[in-house]
Amino acid sequence: SYMHGNYGYFWNRTNVYNNMEVDHVELKDTFADTSEDVMGYLSDELLYRQAVEKLSNYDAPFISYIVAASSHTGFTLDGLQDRSKVSIDVGKYKDTFFGNYLESANYADYAFGIFIDELKKADLYDDTVIILYGDHNGLDMYNNEMIEFLSELDGNVTDVDIKLNYIRVLAGMRIPGISNLRIDKPVSKLDIKPTLAYLCNLDSGVSLGTNMLAKKNFICLNNERIV
């Protein structure tokens, strides 16, 4: 299934995923509760709660691609009915773009915790592989407040530090039976499939990516910059 808290006409999602023969295309107008809206999307919490309800009715095994967007660019949480769900104090960055970004990330973390709790309540968690990743960077590379914040943390922020911070994107996997596995090297979203297949002892077939755990050196080119 594919789930997203926006309407299907945006990016032509309804037609795209139906043409890909996805069994269940769940968009904003297919969810029963649309009472909490953040920047035109269902709030992450509302999306996750209702997503688990739908997952509970699927025949196993299944795969679902869920797109949450409350921490998307814009970083405006005005639509939240309960602002206490944002627990971070951003201090002097309050009401700045950077401060809003931190608050959005904090709320996204809270909502994802709700998702995990709901999976456990539905007896889905123990047998579920969960992959979490961002689709692209958040802030502009040279956001002034972000650079100031990084400087206060580290004291000396170089242009290389700024660029590395800019291209880093959150990614993580939770696989039942596997723990304490950390990868500290540049990888791509294309590498998720072969890595997951390797960890689950499955044949990955043809893939553009490579197993993240393979001991293979390579050069990562990001927009003509060598990392």
Question: Each PLM stretch: what is its role?
Answer:
Residues S1-V227:
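Solvent-exposed soluble domains appended to multi-pass membrane proteins
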